[in-house]
Structures are given as structure tokens and as C-alpha cells.
Amino acid sequence: MSRYRGAVIKIIRRLGELPGLTRKTTTRTSRPGQHGTQARKPSEYAIRLEEKQKLRFNYGLTEKQLLQYVRTAKRIKGSTGEALLQLLEMRLDNVIFRLGMAPTIPAARQLVNHGHIKVNNTRVSIPSYQCKAGDMISIRQHPKSQSIVKNYLQFPGLANMPNHLQIDKDNLTGKINGIIERDWVALNELLIVEYYSRKG
């Protein structure tokens, strides 16, 4: 399944605000589609599916990528759900977004793909690159790279930055000091793990 490239307004009307995907919001409370205004109690499967879709669209993943992350998380000691969130939050494109160096994860992914980002002074062009505590994020010493990120930093996608990250706006650098606290992620990871467990 490919990455979604359709109308994001339909997605946020169906799933709610997804800051990683877009800054756009909608004032319409009904879901898209012919029967969007009809109230019906969702099944347990529908609830788990919706939470999975929230996570997938927010982080900009294909179904295949998300399934691989779930399998990796299951091999990590401890809570599978928390391990899944930590894997996703430590993706380079997400770290760039959380630092305010890009307004959305797709914008952060573009920065990485185009070679604007360095990790520990080495240029990294893989958005899914797994960062770790202690990593330093910087911007390539090129006028275009610096200009893009300076502009983005004036209008960050999120109002607050998680405690495990720090940003130096003057030098356009960021640092990862640890692992994100669970409370910063507005998703129910247990429902997502249950969804894949029941699918076998």
C-alpha cells in the first residue's frame, strides 16, 4: 500500500487533527461521505482500526512500514506499545518536526530527502533513520538549507517541544537528550497493538 497523497481535509474530518500530517483544521464535525452525519456506535474493530489509521497518517507511513515497526517493537523487551511509539518518535523526520525545524512530517521528510539535514555532522538522507539519545541534529552549511529551516522555525507546527529535545535556534542545531515521555503522544498505542495481534 502506498503512502496517502489524497485530500488531507477528508482525513482530518474522519480521524481528527493530525499535526504530523498537516496544519490544516476543519470546522465540520461530520465525517466525509454520504452517511457522515449518521451517528452509530463503532465496533471494537472499528475503534482499533481508526486508531491505527491515526498513527499511520500522522507519521506518514505505508501499511507495510507500520507493520514492520510493530514486528520490530514486539522483539523489544517491555511494552510493545511503548516500544512502537519510541521507534516512530525517534525517526529522523519526526525528530526534525518535533524540533520545529519543519511544520509537518512530510516537510521534514523533504528536508532529509534533499540532503539538508546532518546527524552528528554527517549528512543523512533517509527519513526513517533511527536517532538515539545524544545525537546532534544540524543543518547543512548552505544558504538555501539555512534559509528554509530559519523560516520554518518562525512558525513551528507544534506549540510545545517535548522535554527530551532541545533546540538552538541561533545555530540551527538540535539535540536528543533521551526518549520521549508517553504523555506527549496523543495516540492509544495499545489499540494499535491489539489491531495487529487480532489480525494475526
From Swiss-Prot:
Q: Does the keyword Ribonucleoprotein apply?
A: yes
Q: Show the InterPro entries listed in the entry.
A: Ribosomal_uS4, Ribosomal_uS4_bac-type, Ribosomal_uS4_CS, Ribosomal_uS4_N, S4_RNA-bd, S4_RNA-bd_sf
**Location in the cell:** Plastid, Chloroplast
Highest taxon listed in the record's lineage: Eukaryota
Q: Region labeled Disordered — which residues?
A: 20-42
Q: Which UniProt keywords apply?
A: Chloroplast, Plastid, Ribonucleoprotein, Ribosomal protein, RNA-binding, rRNA-binding
A biological process from GO: translation
Coiled-coil positions are none
Cellular component aspect of the GO annotation:
chloroplast; small ribosomal subunit
Q: Which family does it belong to?
A: Belongs to the universal ribosomal protein uS4 family.
As for what it does, the entry says:
One of the primary rRNA binding proteins, it binds directly to 16S rRNA where it nucleates assembly of the body of the 30S subunit.
Note the NCBIfam families from the entry: PRK05327.1, rpsD_bact
Which protein are we looking at? Answer: Small ribosomal subunit protein uS4c
Q: Organism source for this protein?
A: Guillardia theta
Give the taxonomic lineage as stored in the record.
Answer: Eukaryota, Cryptophyceae, Pyrenomonadales, Geminigeraceae, Guillardia
